[in-house]
Amino acid sequence: MKKVTIIDYGLSNLLSVQHAFAHFGAETLVTGKAEDVLAADALVLPGVGAFKDGMAGLEKLGLIELIRQKAAAGTPLLGICLGMQMLFDESEEFGLHKGLGLIPGRVVRIPSTDVQGRPQKVPHISWDPLNPAGGRTDFLSLIHISEP
């Protein structure tokens, strides 16, 4: 089984992410070291906090270009919460900030009403299904998926 490298840039609930992958039998490495990211079979970019701070953490560790290179080379990359947001071009959170640019688009605030004008809870916090775009399952194939 391939090793899942969980990127530690200072703003993540690393233990929960590591335990989730371990539950399915995946071997994991939690690291903020460039050499470990370079050698990774698959990457997870978790995160909790503000977009600007997350990008600053990656920059401080010298990981921004490395993550872009790994993604361009086809290394599976999963962003969780803030990590997913940082995959986009930019975010409007607390000003306009550049992201990793791996997904075209801008992260914007969730509207406080739905399309019918009904109030909706913000922030949206829940467990939602993971649906890979275009039916891709390359990242999910690294771990065993089972229904509860």
Where are these regions (language model features)?
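Residue-level detector of conserved catalytic or cofactor/ligand-binding positions
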Residues: L140-P148
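Generic structural signal for residues in well-ordered beta-strands
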Residues: E27-T28, V107
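Cysteine-nucleophile active-site neighborhood
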Residues: G49-S126
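Short acidic low-complexity segments
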Residues: T28-A39
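Short, Asp-centered acidic motifs that coordinate Mg2+ and/or phosphate
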Residues: A42
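Divalent-cation-assisted or electrostatically stabilized phosphate/pyrophosphate-binding catalytic cores
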Residues: V17
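Extreme N-terminal starter segment of soluble prokaryotic enzymes
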Residues: M1-T5
